[in-house]
Amino acid sequence: MVKVKICGLRRKEDIEYANELKPDYVGFVFAKSKRQIEVEQALDLISLLDKEIKTVGVFVNEPVENALKIAQTLNLDVLQFHGDETQDYIDNFKNFTVWKAIRIKDKEDLEKTKEFKVNSFVFDTLTKNEYGGTGKTFNWEVLKGFELNVPIILAGGLNENNVEEAIRIVNPYAVDVSSGVETEGYKDFKKMKSFIEKVRGIR
């Protein structure tokens, strides 16, 4: 079954929604964005989170020391690097599960995967001056038949109306959603529920 990651949790209500709906992963964004969260706030929220749900910290070009400190303080399960990080940078996180985001415009962008040794790749939409969470999709067909020796996580503009088609085309390990389960910038329980049900209903 395809796994689900809900990204950009910021409120206690978001944690309550997650505890009821049980996505496989939840993401906390430490990069400058409208979904950015402070470490202390994340610590409080994680203490309320169902222990079966894995935690993902999302970083964009964060200094190594800061990212390590946050990861250790929060005991994060996964570190997702969504910026211009290199393999040399990622080598500082050998004790962690690491996902690297690759922003996709066309098939040539898939070549970037050869530069990294990580646990998974997150394929997101290439948007100028933005690092994810834009609500825009890319052409999933570029991933059709593309094989890696690590799992593929699909992100970028997913929502309850398109996730089934996206999974059919890409057959990812997991799907990653943020704006697609929001209303006016906040997580929406009904949209989260519908999204997760759509994913888990696929056979």
UniProtKB/Swiss-Prot annotation:
CDD domains: PRAI. It holds the Pfam family PRAI. GO terms for biological process: L-tryptophan biosynthetic process. InterPro entries: Aldolase_TIM, PRAI_dom, RibuloseP-bd_barrel, TrpF_fam. It is an enzyme of class 5 (isomerase). Disulfide bonds: none annotated. This is N-(5'-phosphoribosyl)anthranilate isomerase. It comes from Thermoanaerobacter sp. (strain X514). The gene is trpF.
